[in-house]
């Protein structure tokens, strides 16, 4: 499936982009925000990502001409389109999105209007890149079953109990942060 990369600090919009990607049925490619621009270029290109959600400050340090496979780049601050490949109509689509939503859902968008893509849990849903201490990062393909196994482990070992509080400093793009936060 299509791959969608996400890079930025932990925040609600990062989670929205991540969850929207996997519930759409695409493969999410989380990238650690402290990777240098050269590593980010490599990961986006190597993963064959077609969209990138990024913080504005990270985008300011990337070279769009090195990201030729991307169809578009979106800001994690407000989801506006920061860049689109020539010939794409994403900005035009976004300008009319509110009108389209009002026309399609005249009574408003409700919970029952949500329909998730049905995918087998053995399909790759996450392409997580290592820190690359011995060269460029390597992509690790994880399926729904891999992630469900982490949740099952946490439940069986009573990793957390009702009422527990957690202070996590790991980025959501980190393998552990992504699996357990």
PLM regions: where:
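Structural core segment of the AMP-binding/adenylate-forming
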Residues: 23-100
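Conserved AMP-binding/adenylate-forming
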Residues: 1-35
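Conserved S/T- and glycine-rich ATP-binding loop of Class I adenylate-forming
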Residues: 4, 21, 52, 124, ...
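Conserved AMP-binding
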Residues: 8-11, 32, 41, 170-174
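Conserved structural elements of the adenylate-forming
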Residues: 121, 140-161, 166-169, 179
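Conserved pre-ATP/AMP-binding loop-to-beta segment of ANL
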Residues: 94-129, 136, 159-165
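Conserved short alpha-helical elements in the N-terminal third of ANL/AMP-binding
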Residues: 19-24, 173-181
């Amino acid at each position: 499936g299509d791959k969608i990369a996400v890079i930025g600090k932990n925040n609600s919009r990062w989670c929205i982009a991540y969850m929207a990607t996997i519930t759409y049925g695409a493969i999410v490619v989380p990238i650690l925000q402290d990777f240098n621009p050269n590593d980010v270029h490599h990961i986006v290109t190597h993963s064959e990502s077609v969209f990138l959600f990024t913080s504005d400050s990270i985008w300011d340090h990337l070279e769009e001409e090195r990201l030729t496979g991307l169809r578009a780049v979106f800001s994690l601050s407000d989801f506006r389109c920061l860049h689109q490949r020539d010939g794409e109509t994403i900005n035009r689509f976004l300008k009319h999105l509110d009108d389209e939503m009002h026309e399609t859902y005249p009574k408003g968008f409700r919970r029952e209007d949500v329909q998730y893509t049905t995918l087998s849990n053995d399909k790759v849903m996450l392409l997580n890149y290592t820190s690359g201490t011995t060269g460029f990062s390597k992509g690790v393909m994880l399926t729904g079953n891999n992630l469900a196994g982490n949740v099952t482990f946490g439940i069986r070992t009573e990793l957390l109990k009702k009422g527990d509080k957690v202070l996590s400093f790991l980025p959501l793009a980190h393998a552990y942060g992504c699996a357990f936060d």
